[in-house]
Amino acid sequence: MATSNLLKNKGSLQFEDKWDFMRPIVLKLLRQESVTKQQWFDLFSDVHAVCLWDDKGPAKIHQALKEDILEFIKQAQARVLSHQDDTALLKAYIVEWRKFFTQCDILPKPFCQLEITLMGKQGSNKKSNVEDSIVRKLMLDTWNESIFSNIKNRLQDSAMKLVHAERLGEAFDSQLVIGVRESYVNLCSNPEDKLQIYRDNFEKAYLDSTERFYRTQAPSYLQQNGVQNYMKYADAKLKEEEKRALRYLETRRECNSVEALMECCVNALVTSFKETILAECQGMIKRNETEKLHLMFSLMDKVPNGIEPMLKDLEEHIISAGLADMVAAAETITTDSEKYVEQLLTLFNRFSKLVKEAFQDDPRFLTARDKAYKAVVNDATIFKLELPLKQKGVGLKTQPESKCPELLANYCDMLLRKTPLSKKLTSEEIEAKLKEVLLVLKYVQNKDVFMRYHKAHLTRRLILDISADSEIEENMVEWLREVGMPADYVNKLARMFQDIKVSEDLNQAFKEMHKNNKLALPADSVNIKILNAGAWSRSSEKVFVSLPTELEDLIPEVEEFYKKNHSGRKLHWHHLMSNGIITFKNEVGQYDLEVTTFQLAVLFAWNQRPREKISFENLKLATELPDAELRRTLWSLVAFPKLKRQVLLYEPQVNSPKDFTEGTLFSVNQEFSLIKNAKVQKRGKINLIGRLQLTTERMREEENEGIVQLRILRTRKLYIQIMKMRKKISNAQLQTELVEILKNMFLPQKKMIKEQIEWLIEHKYIRRDESDINTFIYMA
């Protein structure tokens, strides 16, 4: 019965029956007139009914809609074209377009069933999307064909004129330009590229007009106002154009209009004047004009390869200014390691501040700073260190190196040793200054030289017990580890501290054992240091000296005590590294003298004959010291800089220890005394060890030669390791890998690299490739 009624009503559900009810509502919607809820729902219902019951209904609805939409648009077209003036036409168009475009989102909604029917089953599974609506497409296509395609050039030109006027400071309604853009964006019928019409027309016109504007404006502004004012102008215009582009150009994700516009502006405002702007860079750096440099940096960073010339200028400035300052202060800093380090740190802080303020610590400029500062630190023109190298009995010299690592080690020693400098600083201040040294050390190429000198100073501090702060001493070892010093070196330093602690326990045990025994010297007055040869690595050279009887008799006692606790180990006595305190008595007073073993041996020659004059020749026989060591020791007793009255007198007078002859006579100064504030002190203590090295002249030469030999061995060893792993490698790649591994210790010289390659070939570790002499092959 229900089916029969539906079939009876089917006749009343035809298009012809319903359109007369539907059309008034459609026209109201097109004209943006109010529609009641009932009318709105009726339209949905009627469209649904016609699409279901009238086979030709959907096509008829589509055609009828098209006709009504076209008619509505023709009326709008007439209103727009009634204006002859381009600006008036643009305003009229935008008014009509805004109303129509709003309805493009509303009118399609009641026609959902039409969409489903016309698109078939496939479409029925898709989510309803107004933007993809057939009705919406019909509305936009009709608008495009009837109005927009005919006047789009006039609209576009008007819009560009408005933008041009805005650039010149004139005000207008920005919605006029935005409306034209929206028309271009929304009226494209190409489903594959909905922005094609917009890109080909509006975007292109916008970019072209922008470029034309600045190609005209920029050169004249530069000519009239100069580079520095022009940079401000260019920066302001780039920011202004970016804001304008965000208003007037399409900003959706798939569109890169703003980026294209900014590239266009950069080309017109910056790239075209790149050389002219960059020509000012060097002068700005010299004058420390950080604000102007920052502005130049922000502009040049937008230009391909714009930063490279600035980096080059910065590097050149740091090197030239840095070396100029070092040369200007050379007289002071070459003799004062504290002043030298302070000068380097002042330079580093100055250049770092420049990079921070001008370039915002940009990594590229930090790298340039590091590269240039490294060149200053490692420059050898002012401070040369020549390392000797003996080959087949012939003394050679390597290429001069910077003395920086040696001076850094000396400064560390001043901070870590009991000195006037360390005494006036707190522990925190000493720590801060050591951290500053480590900062500079990062830039030192030949860190192995620093290591050698630092270890020599540490040896001296530990043996003489003159460290200012033992905790900071041990912390320094860990800091060196943290900054990437080789582990084998740092481990040896740590072992040195262990030896000192073990020696303290041994001393305590020795004193306990002999507290009731009578020794040549009281046990309490003896301090023994047993050092591991591997960690302390002293020279193999033994310097013989004839010891006073008291010391000579003590040695067997110590050896016997040590063997009881450590069987199988042999002690080698290094008198060169020993020191002690002796009491000097004369008619003036009594004084304690801190002396080396060599000084002690010389002074004890007068114990039985205090008022006699002894010749250089007889002192050599009495002490059995080598000639060079005796001369050095005697000079420290006759010309000690801190004493107004020397311990020994001599005749005839000479200018240096080298001028002593076999007949030079020495005697004890019976009027020796310590003078303080112009007053003679009857008692006191003086350290005569001073800066006497705990090494002989020959041992110092060996130390320096050892640096070179160790470099050769490390280079050779690494070459073999690399070749073993690579099997076959080019000369360039081999050298690159070698330098990369060794850079934390030293920078191998080209001559050394070449010599070691030849050595490896000669000893059949590697061979040259027959087809390419610059390629090496590993030989097992």
From Swiss-Prot:
Signal peptide: none annotated. The modification Phosphothreonine is found at residue 210. It is found in: Nucleus. It comes from the Eukaryota. One of its GO terms (molecular function) is ubiquitin protein ligase binding. Residues 713-772 form the Cullin neddylation domain. The gene is CUL5. The keyword Aminoacyl-tRNA synthetase does not apply. GO terms for cellular component: Cul5-RING ubiquitin ligase complex; nucleus; site of DNA damage. Kidney collecting tubules. The modification Phosphoserine is found at residue 34. There is a cross-link at residue 724 (Glycyl lysine isopeptide (Lys-Gly) (interchain with G-Cter in NEDD8)). InterPro entries: Cullin, Cullin_CS, Cullin_homology, Cullin_homology_sf, Cullin_N, Cullin_neddylation_domain, Cullin_repeat-like_dom_sf, WH-like_DNA-bd_sf. This is Cullin-5. It holds the Pfam family Cullin_Nedd8. Its main location: nucleus. The lineage of its organism: Eukaryota, Metazoa, Chordata, Craniata, Vertebrata. Core component of multiple cullin-5-RING E3 ubiquitin-protein ligase complexes (ECS complexes, also named CRL5 complexes), which mediate the ubiquitination and subsequent proteasomal degradation of target proteins. Acts a scaffold protein that contributes to catalysis through positioning of the substrate and the ubiquitin-conjugating enzyme. The functional specificity of the E3 ubiquitin-protein ligase complex depends on the variable SOCS box-containing substrate recognition component. Neddylated; which enhances the ubiquitination activity of ECS complexes and prevents binding of the inhibitor CAND1. Deneddylated via its interaction with the COP9 signalosome (CSN). Component of multiple cullin-5-RING E3 ubiquitin-protein ligase complexes (ECS complexes, also named CRL5 complexes) formed of CUL5, Elongin BC (ELOB and ELOC), RNF7/RBX2 and a variable SOCS box domain-containing protein as substrate-specific recognition component. CUL5-containing ECS complexes specifically contain RNF7/RBX2, and not RBX1, as catalytic subunit. Component of the ECS(ASB2) complex with the substrate recognition component ASB2. Component of the ECS(ASB6) complex with the substrate recognition component ASB6. The keyword Transferase does not apply. GO terms for biological process: protein ubiquitination; reelin-mediated signaling pathway; regulation of neuron migration; ubiquitin-dependent protein catabolic process. Keywords: Isopeptide bond, Nucleus, Phosphoprotein, Receptor, Ubl conjugation, Ubl conjugation pathway. It comes from Oryctolagus cuniculus (Rabbit). Belongs to the cullin family. PANTHER family: CULLIN (PTHR11932).
